[in-house]
């Protein structure tokens, strides 16, 4: 059975002898993400990232493809990379690593653990499970996202609930960071 990677903002990597998922399905410019990597047989391709296609896996026993790199953003001050692709699973070989930006690592078929989950608050993709017959490990969970609002210093920002934060950028601007659903009040 061919395993097809799902399309999305960034595409999923191809499973054994399958096809990779397309990225940027919304048709945005600049693009919001790239396609997953392909495979010819065996190991899976890596998931696409915000700035790069996931790596393809070669013919068995090649390792799983690495996840595509995410996008750096310095809205908080120091640059942080977000939305890396998950690594492809390995078949009797090494699994792919997650892409920079929180992508989870893939798993090989030496056991039944699922693929690694994406890093929280980065939007990184989950890594692929392996192919340990008869058990087929599941893929890892995608990392939760984050919303950051930046305003000039003259504004006052209040956020709820308390899990979200209101801080000051090193340059003086105000920042509201949301890691859970909440409300922003600007005055």
Predicted regions and their residues:
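Low-complexity, glycine/proline-biased repetitive segments and flexible coils/loops
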Residues: 1-187
């Amino acid at each position: 059975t061919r395993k097809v990677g799902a399309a999305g903002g960034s595409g999923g990597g191809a499973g054994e002898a399958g096809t990779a998922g397309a990225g940027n399905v919304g048709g945005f410019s600049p693009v919001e993400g790239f396609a997953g990597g392909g495979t010819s047989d065996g190991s899976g391709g890596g998931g696409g990232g915000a700035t790069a296609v996931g790596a393809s896996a070669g013919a068995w026993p090649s390792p799983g493809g690495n996840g595509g790199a995410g996008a750096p953003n310095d809205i908080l001050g120091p640059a942080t990379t977000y939305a890396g692709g998950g690594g492809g699973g390995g078949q009797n070989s090494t699994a792919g690593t997650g892409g920079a930006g929180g992508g989870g690592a893939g798993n090989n078929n030496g056991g039944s653990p699922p693929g690694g989950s994406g890093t929280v608050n980065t939007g990184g993709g989950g890594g692929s499970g392996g192919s340990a017959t008869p058990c087929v490990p599941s893929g890892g969970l995608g990392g939760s996202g984050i919303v950051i609002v930046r305003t000039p210093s003259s504004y006052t920002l209040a956020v709820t609930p308390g899990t979200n934060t209101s801080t000051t950028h090193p340059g003086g601007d105000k920042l509201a960071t949301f890691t859970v659903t909440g409300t922003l009040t600007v005055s």
